[in-house]
Amino acid sequence: MTEYTPKERLYRALRKQPVDRMPAVCFTQTGTVEQMEASGAFWPEAHADAEKMAKLAEAGHTVIGFEAVRVPFDITAEAELFGCGIKAGDLKQQPSVIKHSVKNLEDLDKIKNYSLDTGRIGTILKAVKILSEKYGKELPVIGSMIGPFSLAQHINGDAWFGNLFTGEDIVPALLDFCADFNIAYAKAMVENGADTIAIIDPTASYELIGGEFYEKYALPYQKKIVDAMKELDVATVLHICGNTTNGLAIMDRTGVNAISVDQRVDIKTATGNVENAIIVGNLDPVAVLWNGTPEDVEAASKKVLDAGVGILTVGCGIVSMTPSANLQKMVECAKNYRY
């Protein structure tokens, strides 16, 4: 069989086309302290500096061996753009949302005039361009963003779930706003060189909101993003935390190319629950990759591969203290696998 470039290989694998072997990629957060030390680009500065962000993302390829480059390393830049307060994090901890900006429709109107060129959103787009110009012909460039449901929760805060249950007008209005922003942001990423979009929507977990609420408040808005990317021939990967086994069939209706599942999902069951998307995952980021040994990683990888995973990767974002040797072993296992 033809030997493909990493870019060609992932393009084909995400579209269920024959490939020479499994891609070795990560669709979730890739930054670790060891990569920071190797690259000289450290958190939290790398969250807000395009050159440092690109340099740390590059380390995922040059240090670990991932056959793709991916930015950013957190899911708070979007909320920050819309006036939310952010705790910057540190060398080991990612940024987090600590203050919310929209309580009602009047507040929502105040954040509608935004620019993608400002703040950390602009920084991320610059980092995508830097990476694309250096690696885009050979490697996939993955642009990641928080999904519309989780972004709405970040913006609306603790009131969000109460508003869902009482059917407040702010809910569909904010979800429409977030999905439209996601589409504009994803298109800007593509314009700057991204060829794959990862949608990280943790608060939309089936474990948290159930099938009825997912179908009403998450599915249509995620699907809008996916449909917009399909028009550009850009693959999409949806990651939602928790045991999403019983929700996979609904998630599959978004039309995404791949669904990323965490370590609590049984891969064999998961692959039987979807018709269109491939299942990617789902090594335990804590017990196996952070606290385990390369031998543990190899054993866990074999189990996941034998269960029929579409692409072997991490079950959630990589813990910043994860040893490079463990990630390198995961990459090796993926590269050695033939479908």
From Swiss-Prot:
PANTHER family: METHYLCOBAMIDE:COM METHYLTRANSFERASE MTBA. It comes from the Archaea. The keyword Isomerase does not apply. The lineage of its organism: Archaea, Methanobacteriati, Methanobacteriota, Stenosarchaea group, Methanomicrobia. Pathway: One-carbon metabolism; methanogenesis from methylated amine. This is Methylcobamide:CoM methyltransferase MtbA. Belongs to the uroporphyrinogen decarboxylase family. MtbA/MtaA subfamily. One of its GO terms (biological process) is methane biosynthetic process from dimethylamine. Gene3D superfamilies: 3.20.20.210. It catalyses: methyl-Co(III)-[methylamine-specific corrinoid protein] + coenzyme M = Co(I)-[methylamine-specific corrinoid protein] + methyl-coenzyme M + H(+). Its cofactor is Zn(2+). The gene is mtbA. GO terms for molecular function: [methyl-Co(III) methylamine-specific corrinoid protein]:coenzyme M methyltransferase activity; dimethylamine methyltransferase activity; metal ion binding; uroporphyrinogen decarboxylase activity. Methyltransferase involved in methanogenesis from methylamines methanol pathway. Catalyzes the transfer of the methyl group from the methylated corrinoid protein MtmC (MtmC1 or MtmC2) to coenzyme M, forming the substrate for coenzyme-B sulfoethylthiotransferase. InterPro entries: Methanogen_methyltrans, Methylcob_mtaseMtbA, Mtase_MtaA_CmuA, UROD/MetE-like_sf, Uroporphyrinogen_deCOase. Zn(2+) binds at residues 239, 241, 316. It holds the Pfam family URO-D. Its EC number is 2.1.1.247. Keywords: Metal-binding, Methanogenesis, Methyltransferase, Transferase, Zinc. It comes from Methanosarcina mazei (strain ATCC BAA-159 / DSM 3647 / Goe1 / Go1 / JCM 11833 / OCM 88). The keyword Transferase applies.
